[in-house]
Amino acid sequence: MKFSEIAQKLSPLVQSQSLTAYPDRNPQIKAITPIETALVDTISYIEGGKFASFVAKTDATALILPLDSNLQQQADERGIAWLASANPRLLFAHAIKLFYQPFQPQPYIHATAVVHPSAKIGHKVAIGAHAVVEANVTLGDGVCIHPNAVIYPGVHIGDRTILHANCTIHERVQIGNDCVIHSGAVIGAEGFGFVPVPEGWFKMEQSGIVVLEDGVEIGCNSTVDRPAVGETRIGSQTKIDNLVHIAHNCQIGQACALAGQVGMAGGVKLGNRVILAGQVGIANQAAIGDGAIATAQTGIHNDIGAGEVVSGSPAMPHKLFLKVAAAYKRLPEIYQAVKQLKK
């Protein structure tokens, strides 16, 4: 693909004032690669920061750059064709689609798939080998069910949603349009509901449902549990990594991002655009406001306000956590000083 063709296809995707290109070179681009291993005839991207130095040494034939005149000049001097954008990472994400399309089977129902006669199947649906679609399931247009996926009775799945191999969707779950459920994920299993009695524990039946709004993505081996009553809901465009647990009655807002090994107890509420880094744990009924961020391994026991950035366990403002961490490193020294004062 010629560089000019790439530029032409990408230019409508960004605001015109935030995209520039060096027009005098039009090389052939054969692949898209990370900047660290870029070779001749490939295109890569640089956001700046520690990667800025790669402009001077990369073998890439073309680059997507930030709106940085110094980096652009370096690329010119090395004969590298370039595009520049206010958001080079986003432009690079669009560029990947020009070179790669994920596997999408043709519409068909495999001979070994088990589809209940009462299931309603939309147009251009693919159902892979050994998949199970039980009674009263509704599949929208363009849905793709990969091999060994299991869909329990009464599930509704919206248009163009993809269920990857070996995922399980329990009864009455509602999944919107353009969602992606990755392999091994379990949506709508029973929440952890038991009442203590003298004999041990009395099981509370989980009669509620799980709702995934449009554009939700659930990573491999993640779980979203249904509640005893009511619903567990994940807002539109929220993205959830692998190995995440979302307990019963959780309410997650729109466009949130949850990294691997996040664990949420029952009844947690997240606002919109909340970011939870890896291994964040959230206690029962805690509420987190819009735009809040929790850094890796934060333990949240109480409510967090909108826009707050928290770290540590128990969670505290990130700036305070940095001071605490600095003091923690000096504890042996401080201990010895206190010990001397006691003498």
From Swiss-Prot:
EC number(s) per entry: 2.3.1.191
Cited function: Catalyzes the N-acylation of UDP-3-O-acylglucosamine using 3-hydroxyacyl-ACP as the acyl donor. Is involved in the biosynthesis of lipid A, a phosphorylated glycolipid that anchors the lipopolysaccharide to the outer membrane of the cell.
Enzyme's top EC category: transferase
Annotated TM spans: none
GO molecular function, one term: N-acyltransferase activity
Descriptive protein name: UDP-3-O-acylglucosamine N-acyltransferase
PANTHER family in the record: UDP-3-O-ACYLGLUCOSAMINE N-ACYLTRANSFERASE, UDP-3-O-ACYLGLUCOSAMINE N-ACYLTRANSFERASE 1, MITOCHONDRIAL-RELATED
Subunit structure: Homotrimer.
Source organism of this protein record: Microcystis aeruginosa (strain NIES-843 / IAM M-2473)
One Pfam family of this chain: Hexapep
